[in-house]
Design a protein with these regions (language model features):
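HotDog/MaoC-like acyl-thioester-processing domains
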Residues: 1-15, 103-154
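Hot-dog-fold acyl-thioester-processing enzymes
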Residues: 2-90
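Short, low-complexity, polar/charged sequence segments that are solvent-exposed and flexible
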Residues: 44-47, 55, 91-92, 130-134, ...
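Short, surface-exposed secondary-structure edge patches
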Residues: 60, 100-101
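Alpha-helix capping at helix-to-loop junctions
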Residues: 78-82, 102, 118
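Short alpha-helix capping/helix-loop boundary micro-motifs
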Residues: 94-99
Length: 154
């Protein structure tokens, strides 16, 4: 499935209730986790100490930070949709966000999306995107919720 191209509010609204798309699989490796730990100053051993995690963690491996998983949402969202004729895009908020299970280092994740709700607020398009970040080979998602974005159409 190719990237969904949206050129106006009406085109976006026509997809209400529909799956918008699925991103490519993305591997979450230890280098990415370490970079995130450095950026956020969160060096908890379950994320960065490979040897200790092998011995002491119930996963027998390090795991990605939950917020690292969340932070990959914009990258994967960009693989799914191209919204044209906008001045800017602003993150508005998150609702019903839940971490279902950790992403074990080396796992592959992808984003699955559906247009949950859409409103025209005096020319600003507020879209609510139901999302799941799936882990390859797992039934339960790593993360799910509703992400709200404001698209300022020209």
């Amino acid at each position: 499935m190719g990237k969904l191209v949206i050129n106006s509010y009406d085109e976006f609204a026509a997809h209400l209730g529909e799956e918008l798309g699925v991103s490519e699989w993305l591997q979450v490796d230890q280098d990415r986790i370490n970079l995130f730990a450095d950026a956020t100053l969160d060096h908890q051993w379950i994320h960065v100490d490979v040897e200790r995690a092998k011995k002491e963690s119930q996963y027998q491996s390090t795991i990605a930070h939950g917020y690292l998983t969340l932070s990959l949402l914009p990258y994967m969202w960009d693989q799914i949709i191209e919204v044209n004729n906008i001045k800017m895009l602003v993150n508005y908020g998150m609702d019903k966000m839940r971490f279902g299970q950790p992403v074990v280092t080396g796992s592959r994740i992808r984003l699955v999306t559906k247009l949950h709700n859409i409103q025209n607020l005096r020319g600003i398009c507020k879209s609510e995107i139901e999302f799941k970040i799936e882990i390859e080979g797992q039934r339960k998602p790593a993360l799910e919720g509703i992400a709200s974005f404001l698209y300022y159409f020209i």
